[in-house]
Amino acid sequence: MLDFLNRMFSRDGGNSKNIAKERLRLVLVHDRSSVSPEIVEALKEDLIKVISSYMEIDERSLEVNLNNDEASVALVANIPVLGLKRRNV
């Protein structure tokens, strides 16, 4: 959660265009569902932790969205996979 706030309000996390784009995306996600932007960001961070234990992923290109229609809400994640990690079973 602190990482989210640092990225939203710091000037070194990326250029202004990318920061504005991320803020707008979070606002749109919130408007389209009853889930707060903070919950969506926490979900994104949890997904990164879990998936990273199995695969190498491009965290900067990862996208998580909530899409809804009249009947349901869908979690849509675009997670670029760079490679698989070997695990000892």
From Swiss-Prot:
Pfam family, one: MinE
Family annotation (InterPro entries): MinE, MinE_sf
GO biological process, one term: regulation of division septum assembly
Keyword terms: Cell cycle, Cell division
Top-level taxonomic group: Bacteria
Function: Prevents the cell division inhibition by proteins MinC and MinD at internal division sites while permitting inhibition at polar sites. This ensures cell division at the proper site by restricting the formation of a division septum at the midpoint of the long axis of the cell.
NCBIfam families membership: minE
Protein family: Belongs to the MinE family.
Record-given protein name: Cell division topological specificity factor
Organism encoding this protein: Heliobacterium modesticaldum (strain ATCC 51547 / Ice1)
